[in-house]
Amino acid sequence: IVASGGDDGVLRRVVRFFEQEGFRVIGPGEAAPELVVREGAAGAARASDEDRADIQTGLALIRALGPYDIGQGVVIAGGRIEAIEGVEGTDRMIARAGEARRAAHDAPRGGILVKRSKPEQDLRVDMPAIGPATVEGAHAAGLSGIAAEAEHVLIAERAVTLARADAAGIFVEGVRDEAPASATPRRFKAHRVVRDLRPLGGVKPRRHSVRDAVKGLATIEALARFGVGHTAVVVRNHVLAVEADEGAEATVRRAEGLRQWASLTRRRRGVVVLRRAEALTEVLVTIVARAGYAGIAIGDDAAAASGDALAAAEREGLFIVTSPSASSEGTG
């Protein structure tokens, strides 16, 4: 179960096991409804009109990522996506955004954490939550508010959380996705997708790497309209990290410490996916090889790929594949 993919797949199997044994599984929202975020402002501060536009963008981005079982949170400011949550969790994502802001000379002021459930997420066993640590992290990162999907997110230690938010001048608000239900894409199943992957060089991907590449390519394509997602890292059908704007090298380094426990073997596993061939450099190849990944997939043709980088990949035993065409779903 653990090796089969993301959290959603694992948890659905766990729930199914207990239900088959005659148990009724209930969620925290049913057991403690007073902890559930309701629509509207929960504290004293209020979101601005600009904040509301960012909130809808953040909700849409997480919705777009839902089929790939990644991301319950994003940090966004003035329409710019600053961080996308991977398997590291919300608090570490906020801290990462804060570090990037402090390092930048033109860092934006304000900004929002948008937190929502993924489409088809089973809220009985995996309900997103915010709490005091979320508020503290948002304040340290210079954010102005937290927008949480109404009826789908919990507030842990509600009184403490809201008191700290009020003291910091941070709004906490329950919001709804304005998009119709028909806008929610269905779950992505890499094994049912047919995609032309063209190897460059003598190293060929194994079947599990092909599936990782297919899922990663679909993930970055889903984010193209948001201007982010130039790099993704996928291991055993699990998307570990997606780039906002930190660059391919930083994204791969970040993902290196986020591997699933089922992937901690000496065998090379996982694929780094790049939207553009220009991102393929000798330095990146070295980072990918040292991190123990099996290869690199590129979402356009190989014309812009560095010959030196391709030669380095061959020396390191990494496969390189390109896939400039869109995928299609098969019937298998």
Q: Which residues make up each language-model segment?
A:
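N-terminal glycine-rich phosphate/adenylate-binding segment common to multiple enzyme folds
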Residues: I1-A32, A181-A183
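Generic serine detector
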Residues: S4, F18, S48, S117, ...
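Conserved mixed alpha/beta catalytic, RNA-binding, or beta-rich assembly cores of soluble enzyme
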Residues: S4-D8, P28-V135, R187, H191-P205, ...
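Residue-level marker for well-ordered alpha-helical positions
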Residues: L11-R12, P132, A159, E282, ...
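Noncatalytic linker/hinge segments flanking ATPase motor cores
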Residues: V15-F18, V87, R116, Q121-R124, ...
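Structural signal for hydrophobic packing residues in well-ordered secondary-structure cores
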Residues: V15-G22, I62-G66, R101, G142, ...
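Short, basic, helix/turn surface patches
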Residues: D51-I62, D166-R187, S209-G216, G317-G332
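C-terminal binding/interaction regions
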Residues: E136-V175, A179, T286-E329
